[in-house]
């Protein structure tokens, strides 16, 4: 089973956690070109393109200016992203065996680096999928990466057993030819809902936390089959057989009213 997670907007370049090995990103040349083009934008342009406040725009202007410098600090991707999902994965207590297993069974999307393994060394950046780069062809990041990533992604899923546990946000499908992915491998997309006033509701923070907890559960317990995936339970979330189907696994918290 291969897990797919979305990258986070927040990143760090400092960690005390040691990993058994580090690797180069598979698309580091493309990432370098993306970062080079991003470095041509002014602070004001980054503020508009990234939809951020001036402080964050300045921070990322500096990041892109330093991206190609030898002294710029790097971290393994799984430690570099610091959003809610990654806090719940909590790789800080992973064993060497956990990291090695994750390297083969987890992939992270990235608008800058394309597709990452957990131990791929990356530099801090911020980028959105709808940003258009002048070269080549003024395309969005989705259009840029789709023809590059799809074959590699499918090959990685097949190598990991032919089943994808898609815990990424919906927009990340745009980085791949998703119809091809669904045609060539089995895709399971877990959903997490709470009952509120007798109806199912989606709470974003719970969804993010649950995605991280499920990723941790799969990696720590070496989950390989879709049946084993149904055993995931956390903070009242349990598999709901009635609401699920072959491609959508629904986990609900609480009871109907």
Curated annotation (Swiss-Prot):
GO terms for biological process: response to hydroperoxide. GO terms for cellular component: cytosol. InterPro entries: YaaA (IPR005583). Pfam families: H2O2_YaaD. Belongs to the UPF0246 family. NCBIfam families: PRK02101.2-5. HAMAP family: UPF0246. This is UPF0246 protein BF3795. It comes from Bacteroides fragilis (strain ATCC 25285 / DSM 2151 / CCUG 4856 / JCM 11019 / LMG 10263 / NCTC 9343 / Onslow / VPI 2553 / EN-2). The lineage of its organism: Bacteria, Pseudomonadati, Bacteroidota, Bacteroidia, Bacteroidales.
């Amino acid at each position: 089973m291969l897990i797919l997670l979305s990258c986070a907007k927040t990143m760090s370049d400092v960690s005390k956690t040691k990993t058994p090995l580090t690797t180069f990103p598979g698309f580091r040349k493309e990432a370098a070109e993306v970062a080079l083009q991003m470095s041509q934008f002014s602070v004001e342009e980054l503020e508009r393109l990234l939809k951020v406040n001036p402080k964050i725009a300045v921070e990322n202007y500096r990041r892109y200016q330093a991206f190609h410098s030898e002294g710029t600090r790097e971290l393994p991707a799984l430690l570099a992203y610091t959003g809610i999902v990654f806090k719940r994965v909590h790789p800080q207590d992973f064993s060497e065996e956990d990291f090695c297993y994750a390297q083969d069974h987890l992939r992270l999307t990235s608008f800058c680096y394309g597709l990452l393994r957990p131990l791929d060394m990356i530099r801090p950046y911020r980028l959105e999928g709808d940003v258009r780069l002048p070269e080549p062809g003024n395309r969005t990041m989705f259009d840029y990466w789709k023809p590059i990533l799809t074959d590699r992604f499918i090959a990685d899923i097949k190598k990991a057993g032919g089943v994808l546990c898609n815990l990424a946000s919906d927009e990340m499908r745009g980085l791949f030819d998703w119809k091809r992915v669904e045609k060539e491998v089995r895709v399971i997309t877990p959903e997490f809902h709470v009952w509120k006033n007798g109806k199912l509701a989606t709470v974003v923070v719970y969804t993010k936390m649950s995605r991280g907890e499920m990723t941790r559960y799969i990696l720590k317990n070496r989950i390989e089959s879709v049946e084993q995936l149904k055993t995931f339970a956390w903070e009242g979330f349990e598999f709901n057989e009635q609401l699920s189907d072959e491609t959508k696994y629904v986990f609900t918290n609480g009871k109907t009213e």
